[in-house]
């Protein structure tokens, strides 16, 4: 047993220090980023925010809506190949280039991914997604996927330390997904005692990835636009959002009415709700590691994503970053014990 004494930080532990700026308006901030990925050699241009591959967030409807903002969606893995065929038929490259095909690591998952990717050349992103990215099986699976799809952009995770980021990149991942337990409907840290404060995880993993020419996704832990900015400031190339994009018309799932008010169900992908729906219940050898909540129905996602991106633009003006890619270079975090004044409630 050993104890690491260095304090690790989450988003609530810091604020940006403001800096002099020559920007006159938020409209001058460029949020579009261009990436060339290490292994595939693919180029992508867009706003590097991703809707999470949860079946109450990462829907086909979400992908279509967010693509209008240049934002990506990791489509959840529970759509059938036939569902995908219909989606491909109905949408052009502007939507498909911003849609990630999510997969697990079983042989059936591999075959399904092959069938989906064969539908069109416009699908360029594959998201290999398991809860515990420290499995040797994940590394082997990434190698297998890279061998099968040498020209596709592969994301893999989830991990929270630089050593595994490096191993996954060397195995063939272009992007590594970072985050264990920070999500709003994730209870992994409570059920297992395992995790890593998300901001420190992003800072450390970004350093490891960028040293090898790889990229990272900061996955989870954001509850407001300021947290999204902090993730980018910490070095995340992409930021993945679940709860912030849940509860919308495009999120998938049914609208529930209680006492005259409308709600939508939102649940973690290791929750009992998810396992009841997709796996026939919680297996005897495991525990559910997610919660199920009812969120007030929020209407169209367009207003929410515009608000999030507006907040990120505002962050950039406060620290003097004319482009999103400059934000991490302009970032100085100060450690704090308070974030906001809650006299009249929390924002």
Swiss-Prot record:
Superkingdom assignment: Bacteria
GO biological process per UniProt: purine nucleotide metabolic process
Gene3D superfamilies: Aldolase class I
EC primary class: oxidoreductase
Gene Ontology CC: cytosol; GMP reductase complex
Molecular functions (GO terms): GMP reductase activity; metal ion binding
UniProt KW keywords: Metal-binding, NADP, Oxidoreductase, Potassium
Positions of NADP(+) binding: 108-131, 216-239
Record carries keyword Methyltransferase: no
Record has Metal-binding as a keyword: yes
InterPro entries per record: Aldolase_TIM, GMP_reductase, GMPR, IMP_DH/GMP_Rdtase_CS, IMP_DH_GMPRt
Signal peptide per UniProt: none
Self-association state and partner proteins as the record states: Homotetramer.
Function: Catalyzes the irreversible NADPH-dependent deamination of GMP to IMP. It functions in the conversion of nucleobase, nucleoside and nucleotide derivatives of G to A nucleotides, and in maintaining the intracellular balance of A and G nucleotides.
Family: Belongs to the IMPDH/GMPR family. GuaC type 1 subfamily.
Protein name per its UniProtKB record: GMP reductase
């Amino acid at each position: 047993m050993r104890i690491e004494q260095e304090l690790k930080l989450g988003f609530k532990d810091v604020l940006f220090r403001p800096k002099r700026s020559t920007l006159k308006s938020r409209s001058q901030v460029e949020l579009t980023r261009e990436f060339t990925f290490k292994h595939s050699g693919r180029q992508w241009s867009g706003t590097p925010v991703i809707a999470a591959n949860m079946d109450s967030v990462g829907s086909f409807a979400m992908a279509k809506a967010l693509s209008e903002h240049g934002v990506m969606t990791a489509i959840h893995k529970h759509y059938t190949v036939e569902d995908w065929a219909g989606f491909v038929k109905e949408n052009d490259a502007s939507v498909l280039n911003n849609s990630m095909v999510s997969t697990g690591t079983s042989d059936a998952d591999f075959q399904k991914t092959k069938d989906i990717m064969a539908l069109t050349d416009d699908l360029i992103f594959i998201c290999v997604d398991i809860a515990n990215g420290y499995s040797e099986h994940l590394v082997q699976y990434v190698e297998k996927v890279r061998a099968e799809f040498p020209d596709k952009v592969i994301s893999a995770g989830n991990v929270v330390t630089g050593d595994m980021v490096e191993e996954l990149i060397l195995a063939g991942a272009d992007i590594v997904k970072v985050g264990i337990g920070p999500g709003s409907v994730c209870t992994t840290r409570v059920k297992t005692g395992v995790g890593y404060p998300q901001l420190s995880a992003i800072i450390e993993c970004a350093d490891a990835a960028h040293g090898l020419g790889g990229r990272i996704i900061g996955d989870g832990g954001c509850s407001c636009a300021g947290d999204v900015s902090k993730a980018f400031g910490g070095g995340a190339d992409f930021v993945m959002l679940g709860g912030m994009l849940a509860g919308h018309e495009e999120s998938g799932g049914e609208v529930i009415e209680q006492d005259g008010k409308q709600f939508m169900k939102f649940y973690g992908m290791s929750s009992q709700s998810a396992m009841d729906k997709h796996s026939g219940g919680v297996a005897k050898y495991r525990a559910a590691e997610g919660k199920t909540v009812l969120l007030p129905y929020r209407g169209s996602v367009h207003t929410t994503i515009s608000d999030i991106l507006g907040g990120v633009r505002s962050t950039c003006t406060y620290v003097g970053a004319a482009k999103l890619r400059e934000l991490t270079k302009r970032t100085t975090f100060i450690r704090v014990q308070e974030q906001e004044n809650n006299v009249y409630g929390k924002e």
